[in-house]
């Protein structure tokens, strides 16, 4: 497997921040505290009583990581009876607000879930709030991580976290709807437009879009411009934004509006949320969805109307342009970081290593993402068709670039998402879009 993950994918470890912090803060109403007696065979001898706190955002019952974290808390206490882990979960924007407030108030936990990329985690690192963990990492742990996967965990030459799982954005197609419409799963842009026309003629919504949250539309421009400019062209523009005001990026903006004018998306796309978009696709309300493989649990749930009816493919190529079907949007996932003021950094890093590997191995087995850790001894016979298809696509990858809001500085990330929303609402022209993009700040990663 080729792994050319950009440093911006700082472990999907997605957007911004400030101030002072302290060590061990408790959870709130959702806090779980584990106890119990005894220790597992091979566990460590009990020593000083230690409590570590961890905040995460895996709270949905459809998120396999929720149970993985809960299990890790119980298992780790059995292995280390003197160590108690208190975990608290909040999701989405609420989590971003909570963690930002906690750091500002000096009430951050020992271990924090962080979104990937420079627009979220890097300001915490620059402010000195997070602990470099190099000196605490064993060679054994590092040897279990797949080649290249620590790159996204490294800032300014220092490792700050460990990978868990990695994600890949795919085009999801409801084969039942395609068959009913007499449409072909697209491999080129022209075939995509033909499929959209046939699906519309059959009275079906071609593509589900939830642009109320802005980032789903951003994913579309991310990949369309990768097909027009190629990932190398994207990297050049991240380093020199003036290049956004050039033919490949204007062409990508034109392609986005071509989709809108072709009635590719649901009419209420600007008022539909991400959750509603995924739920709608799982309910069979749209024939296509472009998203990362974290949508698999929703599509494959027993309650899903599309279970067993969906295939995932690489986004169609645009003939005559620089991009190829082996260039992907994706990268290693968000991760967990240690508070620099943690009173027990060695124990915190040991638990971080345990948790990260467990999410990587168990999460892969349960469809939570693709592996960042050695999984040769993991039974993958239970993987779904979608998980297998997505893993096979990743095997073909020659280049990966993470979501753009992880690449730009925080304010510019918001500007970019706003511009894509305006583009899709037909409020600005492709030329105006490109001109505005050219005024963004260069990414420090390129």
Locations of the language-model features?
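Extracytoplasmic/periplasmic substrate-recognition and gating elements
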Residues: 74-79, 84, 181, 262, ...
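Glycine-centered hinge/linker elements that transmit conformational signals in sensory
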Residues: 196-198, 238-269
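Pocket-flanking alpha-helical
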Residues: 74, 93-130, 142-161, 170-172, ...
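Extracytoplasmic/periplasmic solute-binding protein
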Residues: 160-164, 169, 193-241, 257
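Hinge/lid segment of periplasmic solute-binding proteins
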Residues: 116-170, 193, 219-222, 231, ...
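Short, solvent-exposed loop/beta-turn-alpha elements that line the ligand-binding surface or hinge
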Residues: 132-145, 184, 211, 228-251, ...
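Conserved N-terminal structural module of periplasmic/extracytoplasmic solute-binding proteins
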Residues: 10, 24-120, 126, 139, ...
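C-terminal capping/gating helix-and-loop segments adjacent to ligand/active sites or protein-protein/ligand interfaces
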Residues: 154, 369-378, 388-446
């Amino acid at each position: 497997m080729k792994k050319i993950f950009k440093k911006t994918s700082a472990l999907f470890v997605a957007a911004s921040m400030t101030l002072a912090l302290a060590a061990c803060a408790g959870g709130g109403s959702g806090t779980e505290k584990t106890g119990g007696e005894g220790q597992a065979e091979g566990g460590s001898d009990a020593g000083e009583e230690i409590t570590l706190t961890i905040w995460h955002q895996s709270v949905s019952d459809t998120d396999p990581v929720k149970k993985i974290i809960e299990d890790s808390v119980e298992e780790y206490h059995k292995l280390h009876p003197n160590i108690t882990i208190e975990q608290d979960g909040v999701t989405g924007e609420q989590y971003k607000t909570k963690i930002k407030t906690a750091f500002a108030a000096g009430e951050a936990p020992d271990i924090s879930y962080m979104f990937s990329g420079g627009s979220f985690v890097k300001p915490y690192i620059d402010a000195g709030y997070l602990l470099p963990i190099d000196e605490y990492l064993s060679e054994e742990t590092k040897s279990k991580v797949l080649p290249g996967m620590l790159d996204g965990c490294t800032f300014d030459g220092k490792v700050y976290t460990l990978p868990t799982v990695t994600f890949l954005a795919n085009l999801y197609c409801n084969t039942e709807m395609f068959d009913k419409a007499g449409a072909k799963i697209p491999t080129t842009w022209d075939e995509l437009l033909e499929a959209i026309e046939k699906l519309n003629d059959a009275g079906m919504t071609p593509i589900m879009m939830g642009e109320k949250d802005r980032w789903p539309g951003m994913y579309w421009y991310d990949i369309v411009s990768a097909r027009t400019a190629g990932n190398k062209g994207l990297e050049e523009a991240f380093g020199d934004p003036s290049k956004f005001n050039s033919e490949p990026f204007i062409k990508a903006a034109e392609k986005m509006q071509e989709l809108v004018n072709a009635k590719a998306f649901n009419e209420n796309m600007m008022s539909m949320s991400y959750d509603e978009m995924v739920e709608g696709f799982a309910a069979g309300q749209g024939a296509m969805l472009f998203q990362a493989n974290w949508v698999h649990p929703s599509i494959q749930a027993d309650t899903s109307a599309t279970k067993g009816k969906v295939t995932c493919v690489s986004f169609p190529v645009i003939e005559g342009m620089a991009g190829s079907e082996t260039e992907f949007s994706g990268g290693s996932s968000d991760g967990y970081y240690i508070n620099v003021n943690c009173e027990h950094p060695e124990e915190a890093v040991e638990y971080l290593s345990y948790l990260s590997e467990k999410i990587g191995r168990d999460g892969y087995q349960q469809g939570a993402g693709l592996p960042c850790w050695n999984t040769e001894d993991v039974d993958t016979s239970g993987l779904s068709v979608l998980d297998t298809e997505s893993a096979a696509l990743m095997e073909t990858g020659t280049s990966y670039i993470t979501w753009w809001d992880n690449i730009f500085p925080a304010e510019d990330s918001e500007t970019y998402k706003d511009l894509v929303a305006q583009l899709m609402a037909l409020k600005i022209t492709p030329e105006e879009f490109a001109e505005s993009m050219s005024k963004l700040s260069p990414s420090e990663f390129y």
